[in-house]
Each structure stands twice: as C-alpha cells, then as structure tokens.
C-alpha cells in the first residue's frame, strides 16, 4: 500500500503521491531521520498546498535532501519536483510506484509497504512497524506477512546484484570455469560411448566364431545336397544312355523336384515348405504367421516398446493402426505397471518393517531373559519401538537397499521365469530361458519365438506385465539413490541454488540464505518461527500519526493540550530538539536477518 495524500488544496481533484526513494536520494543522517524525511512531504501536502513558501521553510535544514545535484526538494515558491511529488488526476496508484520500474533503476530501495522494509548498506534488512502507514486497516497474520513482490524479491535482487558486483573473471578463469562445468558431462557421454564400444567388441569376440560355424555347417549341407543331386543326375543320365534303364520326363521332373525341396528345407527350416509346395495356389494351405498368439505377442511388444522379429506389419493401414494403438496403449501399459509396482514396493516396505520389528522384539526378549532386567528394558523397548516406527524426528523412515539388492531382485524373478519356460520348451537351456525372460521384462525384445500353445502364451503375457511391475518397483525404491547420483553428476561444478525451483521457492531460499549469513550458522525452524512471531505476527495496530501526537512528560500542560494539531505540526518540524527526543525514544530497530 503506497503513501498518497487525498487532501490536497488544488483546483483539480489532483493528489500528491510519493514514489519509492532510490539509493541516491538517501539522507546522510540517521536511520530514523531518513524515515521522517520521507514523511515530511506528505504531512505538509496534507495540511497546506505546495505553493506556500512560508510553510516550506519550516522544514529543518538537515532534513532537506536533493533531487539532483542542483535542485532542492522545495526552494521558495518552486513547484515540487516530479521525481518526488507528482501531480496526477488519475488513480492514486500509478506506474511511478511500481516496484518493478524502481528495481530497474536502483539496487537498494526503501519500500514503504506494511510493514516498512529497508535494506541498509551492510545488507541488514530492517522491518519497521511504527512508521508504517496503515490507513485504518487492521493487521492480521496474512496482511502482516512480507509481500512476495517487494520484500523477498528485494532480497533476491540484492543477492544477485552482489554477485554481479564482483570483479569480472579473466578469460583463463572463465575458461577453467566452463571446462569444470562441461567436464563431467563430456566424461559421462564418453563413458557411455566407450561402454557401448566395449560391449560390441566383447560380443563380437564371443559370437563371431559361433556364427561362422553355424553358417558354415548350413553351407556344407547345401553343398552336399548339390553334390548329391549332381551325382544322382549324372548316374541317371549314364544309365539311360547305356540302356540300363529307361527314364521318361515325368520321372526326371519328380527326382529333380525332390532335391529342390530338400535344398529349400535346408535354407528355411521354420516353414512347412514341402506341404505348401504340394498346393501352392490354395491360400488355406499356406502357413500364416498372423495367428492370434503371434498377433498378441506383437501388440504386447508394441506396448512394452520391445521388438518382435517373427511378424511385422506390411500394409499402410496396419502401420497407421499400429501407431495409433501404441499412442494410447503405451501410457496405459506403463501406468498399470507403475501401479502394480507401487503396490509391490509398499508391500515390501511393510514386510521389511514387520521383519525388523519382529527381529528387534526377539532380541529384546532374549536380552531380558539373559540379563534379567525386564522392567527397565521394557520401558526402553517401548520408547525404541515408537522411534523405530516413526524415525528419530517423528517421520516415517525410508527403506534403504543397496543398488545390488535391486539387481538381485530382478535376477531372481528372471530365474523363476526361466524355470517356467524350461517346462514348456524342452529344447531350451536355463541360460537360454533366463536370457529370454530378461529381454522381456527390460523391453529388449521378444526375438523370433513362435508360440503355438495358448497356455504358454498366457504365461508369457503375465510374465511380461508382472516383470515390468517388478522393474518399476526396483526403480521406485532406488529412486532416492539414483536421484542423488544424478544430481551430483549433473550439477558438478556449478551451484544448485534456484535450479528447478518455482519463483516462490526462490524467494524463500533467498530469505533463508540472508538469515544464514547474518546468523553465521545453520538456520533452524526455531529461528524462522522467532522471526515470524517477533516481527511479522501479533503486532498491534499503531496509527501513522502516533509520533506526531506524542507528548513528553515535561510538555504536558494545559496550554500544550489545547494547541491545535496544525500548529503542533509546525512546532514539530521547527524544533530539532523534538526530533532528537523522538529518536531517543525509538532506537534503531534490531536486524533479525
């Protein structure tokens, strides 16, 4: 609420208003004199016009301050400067009082709000409740709090300005600073690329020989088939030439076809080539990859963002449908997995807490039996139970597991799944089944498995959904550690203050930082509570004219009591002794920050 005077003697309905005092307009006198000098123009303009030179001379010499280097506030019959007293027939609150405009032109300012906040040269923040003008408004806990746009913003701007006022760093120092900030990120990306290259090189060494041997065996079989077919054809031709046998065209075609079918079966051993070649024009005789099990596995891999090499969509309509299906289904899948994972994590937390309490009670019981001090240990045990359940500070304690525990949990689930898969796929080894299950739950891929049994298909779907929930549970429990590690790496070499915070949190952090610097140590909740209770809450209403109507004990006479208010104001501003007495009654406000 800005200070303005509605009662101004003027031809128009104009009102005098006072803007925010900038740092260059401060007086070189005491703190109280500075505040009183701010109220002088308002009181004078309230009771008489600014055109009265006699009244203007009533201002003491040491309370005058300069608008610029050559012009005083009032000199003779001159008009008051626009920078301090502005005539305006518009609303009593104008842009001249905007704290944003004032903040662009000054670093420190005297904010005449309720309560009055001022920042001294040494950085102290003074909150004054006596000289603040309230216009008859009652003070409550809400109105007495700092205005976020004025009080705390000034603190934040002061901190930022102090940081900007530091000496600029040289070019090598700036280079070292940016290198320090970029170094952990470059190292992280380099480690990731190196890890990928290392994995590719190791897999290349492990799988190259096996892949070459498998392909060589296949080519050997094809070579043998071609050699046998050539030998058989030559034998049949020789026998026909020598008259040993007679061969017609149909017999030769059947023999040649048989050898070609064998070659095709060797190249593609996953399709019933022989049956399909018998009736190639009959579509019902063809092998269909898009069965319900394979289609279900495909859409499952679409929602879990892992691949399936057995089938893929080829039509344009199918591709559009797959995209639309994934846009709706992927969030649904992960929300469901997260919900189940949260339930599993809460269940695990309750189980571990119950286990810890049970073990603790057993140990206490064994200790009581062993030492025979039941009563004392029972009382101590009852207190410990409360502390263990709620934590030391009365909050629910967090369950902490090392990172290896979450990895072990995932591996245990994959082992259970591999034991299930082995019962359905007799040709699979434990390692093969474990790898298959792990690829499913970490959304690597389903491979090119062909499922024909519906029970086995149902087990795979359930394994994938529950597996994603288990992974989500592990990530949820390990999020605290992962977030701490990520924060350390991401903000290495730079300050974490104000990053990712809202504007309100920035103001609070700035206020606490100022309190910590003034206190010289850690700011506790008691410090904040004392500051709020002592300065901003439970403050009685004090009229803004309290100091003007105040009488000293040596001035209480029948004559003084009948002096009119206006003449008393003249005496008030004429006598510097009165100002000295007022200053003696109101010592400097303590700096709570």
Swiss-Prot record:
Highest taxon of the lineage: Eukaryota
Places the protein is found: Membrane
Annotated transmembrane regions: 186-206, 291-311, 320-340, 402-422, 430-450, 455-475
Keyword Transmembrane helix: yes
Keyword set, alphabetical order: Ion channel, Ion transport, Membrane, Transmembrane, Transmembrane helix, Transport
Function field: Has a role in mobility, possibly in the transport of potassium in muscles.
A single BP term in Gene Ontology: potassium ion transmembrane transport
InterPro entries recorded: 2pore_dom_K_chnl (IPR003280), K_chnl_dom (IPR013099)
GO MF annotations, alphabetized: outward rectifier potassium channel activity; potassium ion leak channel activity
Record-stated family: Belongs to the two pore domain potassium channel (TC 1.A.1.8) family.
A GO CC term attached to the entry: plasma membrane
Topology within the bilayer: Multi-pass membrane protein
Protein's name in the database: Uncoordinated protein 58
Record lineage: Eukaryota, Metazoa, Ecdysozoa, Nematoda, Chromadorea
């Amino acid at each position: 609420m800005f200070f303005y005077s509605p009662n101004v003697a003027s031809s128009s309905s104009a009102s005098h208003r006072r803007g925010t005092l900038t740092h260059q307009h401060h007086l070189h006198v005491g703190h109280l004199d500075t505040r009183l000098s701010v109220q002088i123009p308002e009181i004078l303009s309230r009771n008489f016009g600014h055109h009265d030179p006699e009244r203007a001379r009533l201002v003491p010499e040491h309370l005058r301050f300069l608008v610029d280097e050559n012009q005083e506030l009032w000199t003779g019959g001159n008009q008051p400067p626009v920078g301090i007293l502005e005539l305006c027939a518009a609303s009593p609150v104008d842009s001249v009082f905007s704290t944003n405009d004032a903040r662009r032109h000054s670093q420190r300012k005297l904010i005449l709000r309720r309560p009055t906040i001022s920042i001294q040269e040494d950085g102290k923040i003074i909150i004054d409740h006596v000289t603040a003008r309230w216009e008859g408004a009652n003070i409550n806990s809400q109105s007495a709090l700092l205005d976020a746009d004025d009080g705390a913003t000034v603190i934040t701007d002061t901190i930022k300005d102090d940081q900007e006022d530091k000496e600029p760093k040289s070019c090598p120092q700036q280079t070292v600073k940016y290198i320090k900030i970029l170094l952990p990120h470059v190292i992280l990306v380099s480690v990731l690329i190196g890890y990928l290259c290392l994995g590719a090189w190791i897999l290349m060494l492990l799988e190259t020989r096996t892949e070459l041997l498998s392909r060589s065996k296949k080519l050997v079989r094809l070579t043998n088939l071609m050699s046998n077919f050539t030998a058989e054809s030559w034998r049949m031709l020789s026998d026909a030439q020598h008259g040993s046998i007679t061969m017609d065209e149909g017999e030769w075609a059947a023999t040649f076809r048989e050898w070609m079918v064998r070659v095709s079966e060797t190249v593609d051993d996953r399709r019933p080539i022989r049956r399909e070649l018998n009736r190639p024009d009959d579509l019902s005789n063809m092998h269909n990859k898009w069965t319900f099990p394979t289609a279900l596995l495909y859409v499952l891999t679409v929602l879990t963002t892992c691949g399936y090499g057995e089938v893929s969509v080829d039509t344009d309509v199918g591709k559009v449908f797959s995209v639309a299906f994934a846009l709706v289904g992927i969030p649904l899948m992960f929300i469901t997995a997260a919900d189940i994972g949260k339930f599993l994590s809460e269940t695990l937390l309750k189980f571990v807490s119950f286990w810890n309490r049970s073990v603790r009670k057993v140990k206490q019981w064994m200790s009581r039996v062993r030492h025979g001090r039941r009563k004392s240990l029972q009382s101590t045990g009852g207190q410990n139970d409360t502390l263990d359940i709620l934590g030391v500070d009365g909050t629910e304690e967090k369950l902490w597991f090392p990172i290896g525990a979450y990895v072990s949990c995932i591996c245990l689930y994959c082992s259970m799944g591999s034991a299930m898969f082995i019962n359905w796929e007799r040709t699979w080894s434990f390692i093969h089944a474990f790898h298959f299950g792990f690829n499913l739950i970490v959304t690597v891929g389903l491979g090119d498995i062909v499922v024909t049994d519906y029970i086995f298909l149902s087990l795979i779907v359930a394994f994938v959904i529950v597996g994603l929930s288990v992974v989500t549970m592990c990530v949820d429990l390990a999020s605290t550690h992962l977030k701490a590690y990520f924060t350390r790496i991401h903000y290495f070499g730079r300050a974490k203050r104000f990053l990712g915070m809202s504007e309100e949190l920035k103001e609070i952090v700035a206020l606490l930082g100022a309190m910590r610097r003034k206190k010289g140590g850690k700011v506790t909740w008691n410090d904040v509570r004392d500051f709020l209770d002592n300065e901003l809450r439970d403050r009685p209403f004090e009229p803004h004219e309290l100091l003007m109507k105040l009488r000293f004990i040596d001035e209480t006479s029948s004559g003084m009591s009948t002096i009119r208010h206006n003449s008393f104001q003249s005496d008030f501003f004429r006598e510097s002794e009165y100002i000295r007495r007022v200053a003696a009654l109101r010592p400097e406000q303590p700096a709570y920050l």
